[in-house]
Amino acid sequence: MSIKLAVKKAIYNYDSAEKLEDAKIIGGNPNGIISYNQCPQAWAYPLYKNMEDRTWFPRQINISKDKVNYSKLPEEIKQGYDLVLSQLITNDSIQTNQLMDSINQYVTSPVVNACLSHQALEEARHAESYAVMAEDICQDTNRIYELYKHDEELFLKNKAVADMYNILYQGATPTEKDILLAFVANQVLEELVFPGGFVFFYSIEQYMPGSSAMIKEINGDETLSHVPLFQNIFNTAIKETFNGIIPEEVVEKAHRMIGHMCEAEIKWTTYVTKGILGFSEHTIKVFIESQANSVCKNLKLPLLYPVVELKDNPLRKLMLDHLKGGEVESKTMFFEENATEYAKGNLDMNVDLGSVNWDD
């Protein structure tokens, strides 16, 4: 079987004969013009509007109590705070760059390009949020940004994330299967790598309420926009380019990627909590493996780990309690309502937009 190389789109392709309504996720030949009303990926514009509606700004979050309480934190919790903050800064810095420098070059549907551009903006905003926390709360800002140079576990965790994304750089030109794996990597970062750090901040909310509130907004962006975005990008690309069948090679490599990052995340989350927050290694393992299974489920891959009951898992409960209600719930309703509105037009909304099952 011949290897099909991925097509890098032109900025403006005036020779294109491709109709706007024929745009594909990968392998297309677009002219580069964004037409929201003629996009064949019916989920793309509603997701874009959802991202717009979720706009928020880091300086709106009150962190005054955190400034006072940071110096009073037990040393173990303060160390965990610094480590997790440093790691999240790296995640979103990498994500901001790779979305525009790598992924978006090979996505050939203009409206989906717009969604990815909006996500990159949100990732940059998340990095700004962490900067606010590092500069206004922590005692040594430069130390936070350079902590990976001094902590081996943090260095290894950051390297694992970077290595996962290097799939696009293994050859001079990536193949279409490489692009699929890059989509998987994005889903892994959003759904598997971030949650451990998020629940750490939720667990110290009574001491650091502003930090927890900031993370809640970031978590809402990831859960309500970024996870369904790459879920739909991957599944649509499989349908459009691979006749609805995920290539076995992609399944095998995706499983290795997910499994490797799951192990790295369990090790990292165990390291930064050190049992100080009442999280046992078993509790962490079950939670992270369930997140890995969620990645598989959303991408229609076979599950990697046994399905377990999560109702009483404290990490899962922490995350869902903070995503339920308030702004995040209202944004979910907005998204559902707008999806219905778009369905009244010519868009086929009978697609899986991605959602959070609050009762799992």
Residue ranges of model-derived segments:
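Non-heme di-metal
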Residues: 2-360
